[in-house]
Curated annotation (Swiss-Prot):
It holds the Pfam family MinE. The keyword Cell cycle applies. Prevents the cell division inhibition by proteins MinC and MinD at internal division sites while permitting inhibition at polar sites. This ensures cell division at the proper site by restricting the formation of a division septum at the midpoint of the long axis of the cell. This is Cell division topological specificity factor. InterPro entries: MinE (IPR005527), MinE_sf (IPR036707). It comes from the Bacteria. The gene is minE. Coiled coil: none annotated. Belongs to the MinE family.
Amino acid sequence: MTLQDLLDRILGRQPASATTARERLQLVLAHDRSDLSPELLDQMRREIFEVVAKYVDIDLEEGDVTLETEDRVTALVANLPIRRSMASSKPGS
């Protein structure tokens, strides 16, 4: 996510349709290059959420795991908003 994307999200601005189309195409290409089925990607998302949730309280509705491609390199990117760490929610800490 670029700084401009972050500002647009915070300010509630909608991306242009060309930008949305380009991002969708990049997602399709990333899926093709990674050779991951949608089912496997969904399973990975669930497991990543489960593991991270053991350590911090995350917002599952806002969280997302995606494949992103930049300069012919595909990356698995997790965007998981953290509400608080589990250590801060334990009594006596």
